[in-house]
Amino acid sequence: MPAAFPCVFPPQSLQVFPQMIVKVWEKQSLPLPGLRGSPVERLYLPRNELDNPHKQKAWKIYPPEFAVEILFGMVSVDSLLFVLSSPHWWLHLAQGSFWMSEGGFSLCHPGWSVVAQSLLTSTSAFCVRAILLPQPPE
């Protein structure tokens, strides 16, 4: 099981945008973990593949066509573009927080309780372990 990080946001990070586009790697001292040549440039997760312990409750909120899409791309040798969006106009993703270190990254989004660390290598590409969506009320 990968390490998990709590999501904590300062008040200024709650501005709403239809998608989130952030450079997550700009560090000259470490080489960017290999994305070039990776078979994965896009990760599309339909509703039935999202890991959620409250699926029956969540499915009442999220329609059958709900999905999360994550796009990856290199901007330059030392920066990586990460885009998180949804094809649904009613789902607006707010600005999140990113942490990246040698060999891994994690991200958070307002409303998510926790995210798991994900390794970035040329062989595994992004292994997104879990994105925990906002949970419906009990």
Swiss-Prot record:
InterPro entries: C2_domain_sf (IPR035892), Tensin_C2-dom (IPR014020). It holds the Pfam family PTEN_C2. Disulfide bonds: none annotated. This is Putative phosphatidylinositol 3,4,5-trisphosphate 3-phosphatase TPTE2P1. Residues 1-75 form the C2 tensin-type domain. It comes from the Eukaryota. Gene3D superfamilies: 2.60.40.1110. PROSITE patterns: C2_TENSIN.
